[in-house]
C-alpha cells in the first residue's frame, strides 16, 4: 500500500539556492561558481515575492544568509530542505538523471573552443549546407541568432554552436530552413556524437522566426538525447506497471526511457502548468508519477542574465501553485525542486553549481518543517520506496520524514 497514490515532481529548471560545496571546480567565464546563488541574488537584487512557496516553507531552507524577501513563515504547510549534487556536471541532463538515481562519474564532452572541424564537415556533407564557422563556439542562444540570423537568411548556412553544457545546437530560421529539414540534420548530428571524441548529452534543434533585430525562438525546439546508461527509477516504475507521465522536455531528457505517457512539449511555463493540471485531472491517472520540467526560468532569463525577468517568472509560477494544489487529491504528494543553478546576476551566461531546493507538500501530512539535507537522488529513492520498487544507483529515501 503506497503512502501516496500519486507523486507530482516539478522541476523549476535552474532555480538553485546557493553555491554547492564543490562550486570552486565549476566556472563561468573563468569565474568559479563559489559565489553563485540564484534565489538569493534574485531576492536581493530584484525582490522576490513568492507567498505560496513561502507558505510551504521556502524561507525555512537552511542558508548562510536568509532569503532577503522570502520570510520564514510561522506555520509552514510542508517539508523543505536543500539537496547537493554528486555527479560531475551542472547540465540539465546530469541533474535530471541524478534526480532519478544515477551518478554520472564520467562527464560528457564540452567544447569551449567549438566543435572539431571533422564534425562540422560531416554536418555539411550530410545537409548540403555550409556551417557558419564564426558561430562554432559557446554562445548565448539568443545572441547567436542576433549575430548570425541575418547572414543565415541571406545564405541558408547553418548556425551550429555550443555552450558550457555538452550540447550541440543548430539554430535555423523556419522560413529559410524548414523545421522538418532541421530535425533531420539534428538526427544525423546525434548519430555522430555518441562516442568520444565528441560524446554529447544532447543535440538541440533551435528554430526561430522574425526579422533582424527581432528574432524569436519558437516552441518547435526539439532535443535529441541519449538514453540513460543504466535504469533509472522511471524504468523501475514502468517495469512494475506504474504509470509515469512526462510534461515538457522530460521525455527528451530521458530519451523516452521509463516514460509511459508523454504529455508533450511546453510552449511556455504557463502552458506547462496547464498540461500538468490536465494530467492531474486524467481519470486514468489513479496511481503513479508525474514529472514536469518548466524551462523558462533557465532558457529565457538565467542564460540571458535577466534577474527581473527571472523574478517575474518565479512570481508567475507561484501565482499558479494554488491551482496545482487544488487539482491534487488528498493522498497526492507534490515535490518542487530544480536541476542546477543559473544565477542571473553571475558572470558568464551558463549554469551555476548550486544546491537545489526541495519543497514537499501533501494534504495528508499533518507535520511540517525542515528535513535533513541530502542529495539529488534522494528524490527518486523516496519515490521508489513509496511505490515499492528498487532504487537506482544512489539515493536515500526521506519518505519516513513526511508525516
Curated annotation (Swiss-Prot):
Positions annotated to bind Mn(2+) 2: 298, 303, 351
Catalytic activity: 2-deoxy-alpha-D-ribose 1-phosphate = 2-deoxy-D-ribose 5-phosphate; alpha-D-ribose 1-phosphate = D-ribose 5-phosphate
Listed CDD domains: PPM (cd16009)
Record InterPro entries: Alkaline_phosphatase_core_sf, DeoB, Metalloenzyme, Phosphopentomutase_DeoB_cap_sf
A cellular component term, taken from the record's GO annotations: cytosol
Root EC class: isomerase
Domain of life of the source: Bacteria
Cofactor or coenzyme needed: Mn(2+)
Example of a GO MF term: magnesium ion binding
Pathway note: Carbohydrate degradation; 2-deoxy-D-ribose 1-phosphate degradation; D-glyceraldehyde 3-phosphate and acetaldehyde from 2-deoxy-alpha-D-ribose 1-phosphate: step 1/2
Positions contributing to Mn(2+) 1 binding: 13, 339-340
UniProt cross-references to NCBIfam families, sorted A to Z: deoB (TIGR01696), PRK05362.1 (NF003766)
Function recorded in the entry: Isomerase that catalyzes the conversion of deoxy-ribose 1-phosphate (dRib-1-P) and ribose 1-phosphate (Rib-1-P) to deoxy-ribose 5-phosphate (dRib-5-P) and ribose 5-phosphate (Rib-5-P), respectively.
Record-stated family: Belongs to the phosphopentomutase family.
Name of this protein: Phosphopentomutase
Lineage: Bacteria, Bacillati, Bacillota, Bacilli, Lactobacillales
Record gene name: deoB
